[in-house]
Amino acid sequence: MAVVNVEVRSPLSPDEVLRVLTDFSERRAEAWPGVDLDRLVVHELGEDFAEVTEGNATTWERERYEWDRAAGTVTAKTLDSNVWGEGSRWDYRITPVEGGSQVGVRLERYGKNIKGKLIGALLPVAGKKVITDGLRSALKLT
């Protein structure tokens, strides 16, 4: 198992951060460069949940997103993936702060094959920077 924790401050309000995290339209690929539009499939979308397949040629996963606006949380649990196994997930915590939001992210990855285990082994080394940079970039979009 690989775990990465990051904290990012954003000028966006908590509601704006939540919108970026839960926007499954074609804008998702603009906010998250690791998501290819041709691999983005929204299977089900509700008021506070979504089941989505997203990713790129290297890695993809089908996830169940659930969010709670009042609590400021978003969770994405992996249902299927070409590299990640059961228990893999993203947890976001959005806290209002003066001038925007503080966003905490916890990523847990369980490699289900050799490719997943190799990528997972690199996460503690390079994952924090990659996730932090990606999140900072995405949260500048409104």
Regions found by a protein language model. Give the residues of each.
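Hydrophobic ligand-binding cavity/cleft-lining segments
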Residues: 1-47
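Short, surface-exposed coil-to-beta transition loops
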Residues: 2-5, 59-64, 85-91
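A short, structured loop/turn motif at beta-sheet edges
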Residues: 11-15, 45, 67-72, 93-102
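Hydrophobic pocket/interface hotspot
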Residues: 17-21, 65, 76, 103-105
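Short amphipathic alpha-helical signal-transduction/dimerization elements
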Residues: 25, 29, 123, 127-142
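Glycine-rich portal/gate segments that line the openings of hydrophobic small-molecule binding cavities
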Residues: 36-82, 137-141
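Beta-strand/loop substructures that line and gate deep hydrophobic ligand-binding cavities in soluble
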Residues: 77-132
